[in-house]
Curated annotation (Swiss-Prot):
Pfam family, one: Maf
PANTHER family listed in its UniProt record: BIFUNCTIONAL DTTP/UTP PYROPHOSPHATASE/METHYLTRANSFERASE PROTEIN-RELATED, BIFUNCTIONAL DTTP_UTP PYROPHOSPHATASE_METHYLTRANSFERASE PROTEIN-RELATED
Keyword field: Cytoplasm, Hydrolase, Nucleotide metabolism
Protein name: dTTP/UTP pyrophosphatase
Originating organism: Bacillus cereus (strain ZK / E33L)
Length: 191
């Protein structure tokens, strides 16, 4: 039987696959992510997810490889992972009291088929005080997350409203993924 391989070292993606009962192994993609001239955030996340999955699939062609990528956007500006605490603070100040978009792209590669898709979720933050932002940054939680927050952690207290898939904001639209895996004859709903 073909194995499912997650081409990511993200603990959040690992947890979501485990939560859904998807059997998998992890092989972290070492690909250098490159963003070309793309017209939309959805194109970017699907391309990056495909780059990650393709790099792992090269040496695992008999298996199904999953790649994923998440970005946060606000007014056409892409907010990736902050490079330092000052950048994290700038991002959180930018998002304070506003609605932003989170895009997660997924690529599923097998020998006979490749599927890519994305989910877009709108997230609205409460107005944040400087003290709230500074305390959150001091926790170190935002430093490895796109947009400088983790909706599944302490960053959850900043969220006023969400429209779309919560799990996509965490890093993997698990409900959609499980449905897409059926195209590869993988059905975890009966496991």
């Amino acid at each position: 039987m073909r194995k499912i391989i997650l081409a990511s070292g993200s603990p959040r993606r690992k947890e979501l696959l485990e939560l859904a009962g998807v059997p998998f192994e992890i092989i972290v993609s070492e690909v250098e992510e490159t963003i070309g001239a793309y017209s939309s955030p959805s194109d970017i996340v699907m391309s990056l997810a495909l780059q990650k999955a393709s790099a792992v699939a090269e040496n695992n062609s008999d298996h199904i490889v999953l790649g994923a990528d998440t970005i946060v956007t606000y007014e056409s500006r892409i907010l990736g992972k902050p490079s330092n605490e000052a950048e994290a603070k700038e991002m959180l100040q930018l998002l304070s009291g506003k609605t932003h978009e989170v895009y997660t792209g997924v690529a599923i590669i097998a020998k006979d088929k490749t599927v890519t898709f994305y989910e877009r979720t709108e997230v609205t933050f409460w107005e944040l005080t400087e003290e709230e932002i500074d305390a959150y940054i001091a926790s170190k939680e935002p430093l490895d997350k796109a947009g400088s927050y983790g909706i599944q952690g302490k960053g959850s207290i900043f969220v006023q409203h969400i429209q779309g898939d919560y799990y996509s904001v965490v890093g993997l639209p698990i409900s959609r993924l499980v449905r897409e895996l059926k195209q590869f004859n993988i059905d975890v709903t009966h496991a």
